[in-house]
Amino acid sequence: MSRIGKMPIPLSNQAKIEIKDSNIRVSGPKGTLEQRLTDQVTVSEENGLVTVLRIDDSKKAKAQHGLYRMLISNMVDGVTKGFTRKLEIAGVGYRAELKNDLLALTLGYSHMIYFKAPDEIKIEVPDQVTVLVSGIDKALVGQVAAKIRSFRKPEPYRGKGIKYEGEVIRRKEGKAAGK
């Protein structure tokens, strides 16, 4: 049995879960998330614990078991606590600002880059070199953060670009001086 899949998911007092046929809905103080389940797993809730069981030991069912357990766990965490991804901008003249729900990025190009986030995602700019992406859907928060990072990925020679908080950029030496 999957090590991740067999662990029960504890429900907090704030989260409520509804299981109907092949759909699961988790609601909490921050919002509501829905997920369609595959026919390879079954979900049950009792005594504040959600358990995910697979229907057989086929390869596909084993693969889906841990996946759906983590998806449901992330849904519970999202509607109660939420998720945040912090991006750091490094480089001379590189900065970010918020203009009318648009993230305006100056990243060394000849033009500014404007990014409109989905409605479910909240973007904050506490200072010019920090961008906070937050929301209740972990996958969507990560996807939006990756999209913002893709506008100017960190480069290994000077370390300029947009990187995740705590991300380590392997630095390269560059060209050696003439001999």
UniProtKB/Swiss-Prot annotation:
Biological process according to GO: cytoplasmic translation
Entries under InterPro entries matching the protein: Ribosomal_uL6-like, Ribosomal_uL6-like_a/b-dom_sf, Ribosomal_uL6_a/b-dom, Ribosomal_uL6_bac-type
Keyword Ribonucleoprotein included in the entry's annotation: yes
Source taxon at top rank: Bacteria
Keyword line: Ribonucleoprotein, Ribosomal protein, RNA-binding, rRNA-binding
One of the record's GO molecular function terms: structural constituent of ribosome
An annotated GO cellular component: cytosolic large ribosomal subunit
HAMAP family in UniProt: Ribosomal_uL6_B
Subunit description: Part of the 50S ribosomal subunit.
NCBIfam families: L6_bact (TIGR03654)
Protein purpose: This protein binds to the 23S rRNA, and is important in its secondary structure. It is located near the subunit interface in the base of the L7/L12 stalk, and near the tRNA binding site of the peptidyltransferase center.
Family listed: Belongs to the universal ribosomal protein uL6 family.
Protein name (Swiss-Prot/TrEMBL): Large ribosomal subunit protein uL6
